[in-house]
Structures are given as structure tokens and as C-alpha cells.
Amino acid sequence: VIVAPEWHGQVPAGLKNFFLLFSRFELGHKPALIVTVSSADGGAYPVAELRMSSYKNNRLCYIPEHVIVRNVEKVLNGNSEENDSSADAYFRERISWALGILAGYASALKPMRDSLQVHHDKFGNGM
């Protein structure tokens, strides 16, 4: 699960650096769920940015589903009195559903990761 706070409409630099430092050997052909958080109605730009470039050489496989937690201060708090109850229930259900999808992709991609087919020294980096 990749959690990215929206930072001025972008993914924070530290998270971008993570994707540059790790290679196909650590992340390759593993499924990932993108979760972005925003203090307002944003959060979509980091999803697009992650999908566009963060997987190139490390070969991380983003699943089609993602979660954008908007108005994050009003949901998922330990103290339920601080939550917007309907939004909180929605996000909890949505996150649970998305994690189930991620688990399915993890099972489906495991044989691919275990095969030698995905590790080719001549084609070590993305195009």
C-alpha cells in the first residue's frame, strides 16, 4: 500500500526518492494500491503522478483501484466524535474493499514473480 499525502498538488519528494532508490529486485511485479490523502477536496494529482512515472524501473504493478481520502481530518480518526460518520463509514468500507482487491492481485502475481521470465538482465530497466 503506497500512501501519499498531497503536497502542493504533488507526491512528496521523499516518496519519489523511494521509487528511485528501489529496483525491480525489491518491488518488481508486486501489486500496489495507491492511497492519497488531502486536507481538502484534492488528492487526484498524486494518483496520476504515481501511475505515470513511479513504477518505470522498479516494475511495481499498480492495481486499477485506488483510494483518495479527501477532507482527511474528518475521517478515520481514533475518536469517533471527530469523524463525519457517513464519510468515515464510506472510507472504511472502500479501503476494506480495495485491500481485498489488492490481496487478489498479490495471489495472481505471485507465480509471475517466482518465474525467471520477469528477470532479464538485458532488459533491466523500463523503456
Regions found by a protein language model. Give the residues of each.
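Helix-loop-strand module that forms the ligand-binding subsite of alpha/beta enzymes
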Residues: 2-58
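Glycine-rich phosphate/pyrophosphate-binding loop and the adjoining helix
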Residues: 63-127
